Amino acid sequence: MKIEDCTVEENVQIAKDTYKMKIKGNFVKECRTPGQFVNIRIGDGREHVLRRPISISEIDRGENLVTIIYRIVGEGTKFMANIKKGNEIDVMGPLGRGYDVLSLTKEQTALLVGGGIGVPPLYELAKQFNKRGIKTIIILGFNSKDEVFYEDEFKKFGETYVSTIDGSVGTKGFVTDVIKKLQAENNLVFDKYYSCGPVPMLKALVNAVGEDGYISLENRMACGIGACYACVCKKKKKDDYTRVCYDGPVYLASDVEIE
């Protein structure tokens, strides 16, 4: 983990309130597993004391670049949306533990399920699975058509399905409605699933397909390094808690309570 002044190589809007930023820095050499995140300081850190945790969407170690995708939800991310190409930002990272890309072998099948701003970390995962010859089935959930992003990018790596709550594109409803449809058609055969999204989506996913998979939690975070215990969640098999920013954010679905 490093704290580094990095250069913004790109910062563009890709969907409603959603932006893609490319960051260049030496910390990228330490990025290894899909699902890790960075903590970005907002301005000089005086007006906005807490950094903003943003998942890493793509890793390019050859060019020392990472791509992050974020949504404007408050003053911090609004500030980020106004950062220009060539500006410097203070980045702490990489942080957390990501998905186990070695949990499947060649010719096995992975089911990737993302909801909203939980979609981005699955892109690097799909890319790495593709390189290893692992088939991927990808399901992406959004509220509406104007919030959809990266559908075409994911299609490069596997069968890709989109759901929207209002039915403006893809299957009307939730990611689990796509799953039910594929199950009814006997078109959903996979060895393990990998997911990231809001708590209701993760709960519904586990109810639909069981616990043999990975979930990435989106708990609110403060320090990002496990020191403040602001982002803990409860373990299933013992009366204990785990720090999402340090021990996660990716867990086996069978290991933690989804609350």
Curated annotation (Swiss-Prot):
[2Fe-2S] cluster binds at residues 223, 228, 231, 245. Residues 1-101 form the FAD-binding FR-type domain. GO terms for biological process: 'de novo' UMP biosynthetic process. FAD binds at residues 52-55, 69-71, 76-77. PROSITE patterns: FAD_FR. InterPro entries: Cyt_c3_hydrogenase_gsu (IPR012165), Dihydroorotate_DH_ele_sf (IPR037117), Dihydroorotate_DH_Fe-S-bd (IPR019480), Dihydroorotate_DHASE_ETsu (IPR023455), FAD-bd_FR_type (IPR017927), FNR_nucleotide-bd (IPR039261), OxRdtase_FAD/NAD-bd (IPR001433), PyrK_electron_transfer (IPR050353). SUPFAM superfamilies: Ferredoxin reductase-like, C-terminal NADP-linked domain, Riboflavin synthase domain-like. It comes from the Bacteria. Pathway: Pyrimidine metabolism; UMP biosynthesis via de novo pathway; orotate from (S)-dihydroorotate (NAD(+) route): step 1/1. One of its GO terms (molecular function) is electron transfer activity. Binds 1 [2Fe-2S] cluster per subunit. Binds 1 FAD per subunit. Its cofactor is [2Fe-2S] cluster; FAD. Keywords: 2Fe-2S, Electron transport, FAD, Flavoprotein, Iron, Iron-sulfur, Metal-binding, Pyrimidine biosynthesis, Transport. Responsible for channeling the electrons from the oxidation of dihydroorotate from the FMN redox center in the PyrD type B subunit to the ultimate electron acceptor NAD(+). Belongs to the PyrK family. Heterotetramer of 2 PyrK and 2 PyrD type B subunits. This is Dihydroorotate dehydrogenase B (NAD(+)), electron transfer subunit. It comes from Fusobacterium nucleatum subsp. nucleatum (strain ATCC 25586 / DSM 15643 / BCRC 10681 / CIP 101130 / JCM 8532 / KCTC 2640 / LMG 13131 / VPI 4355).
